[in-house]
Amino acid sequence: MADKSIAFIICVNDETYFEECLFYINRLRLPDGYIAEVYPVRQAESIFQGYNMAMQQSDAQYKVYMHQDVFLIDKDIIRYFLELFEQQPKAGIAGVLGTNRYSNERSFSEAGIWAMCWDAVKGKHFTIICRKNRLWRRP
């Protein structure tokens, strides 16, 4: 596993949004020694199938799963996530949604969703960064 590699796995069905998403990824300030890889997911049967395929193609320790219309405007957001993982060694996933307990079903609806919002956002957004590989499945 590539310890200092970060894979951005992005579902794409609109190239204009994807290009803007890439613009912000390319402006991120990654910690020294870290590299970014981008895995666009196009024409997958489902978002879950697409994420699983891209996850298996990458050996990056950290994988950022996101939609094409998410723009990472805070240039240090990856550093914040890496610091969070360092401070919380048992954490394996962080992002827009989270839970205070583990569900064997891996279903947010059964796991008790909680969230902490750093900034107000409008619209539907999806960004999750994982330190460990977990298969995605339909809820």
Regions found by a protein language model. Name each.
Residues 67-71:
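The conserved acidic donor/metal-binding loop of glycosyltransferases
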Residues 63:
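Short aromatic/hydrophobic "clamp" motif used to bind/position activated sugar donors
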Residues 113-139:
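Short, flexible, basic/aromatic active-site loop/helix in glycosyltransferases
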Residues 44, 76-113:
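Conserved donor NDP-sugar-binding/catalytic core segment of glycosyltransferases
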Residues 44-58:
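Glycine-rich, basic loop-to-helix element that forms the pyrophosphate-binding segment
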Residues 22, 52, 60, 74-86:
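Short alpha-helix within the catalytic core of nucleotide-sugar-dependent glycosyltransferases
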Residues 34-46:
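A short beta-strand-loop structural module common to alpha/beta enzyme folds
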Residues 1-27:
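N-proximal low-complexity "stem/linker" segments adjacent to membrane-targeting elements
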